Amino acid sequence: YLAANLSRKQLLEALRYHYALLRGCMSAEEFSLYLNTPGLQLAKLEGKNGEQFTLELTMMISMDKEGDSTILFRNSEGIPLAELTFTLCEYQGKRTMFIGGLQGAKWEIPHQEIQNATKACHGLFPKRLVMEAACLFAQRLQVEQIIAVSNETHIYRSLRYRDKEGKIHA
């Protein structure tokens, strides 16, 4: 969970801190929406030709190894075009947004969807938009630093996952 170089104690404390901070900074209704599908809408954006996009804060089981919250950028059909996963924690004595993953659209989404969204959003790529949303969300929560996991410390580099490389499980 989160990063390969963190202890279990650090991970447990991060988990506790994350939910306590969110619960303290959100109304009961917002927190309930965040905990449930489809999530809490952070913003509704209109493209330069009237295209509709949303930024949502949610929990995604598929991303839970990389963090506890995910900011999604979706098109008008609800297709995720980018996602950023993070956990709020205290790291080195500072309130921190710890980014565990930043991903574009799934492989089956035509690249044209990304190009259309980028054009509609005045040249801003979907990943850039979720990064900007994360920075603004962090600012709202008075986060003191934003850090991201490196390739070397990414959770899928931990021994638990490295042992499975190249093996097929049926």
Language-model features and meaning:
Residues 83, 91-170:
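Acyl-donor binding region in acyl/amide transferases
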Residues 1-117:
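Non-catalytic substrate-recognition and accessory regions of acyl/acetyltransferase enzymes
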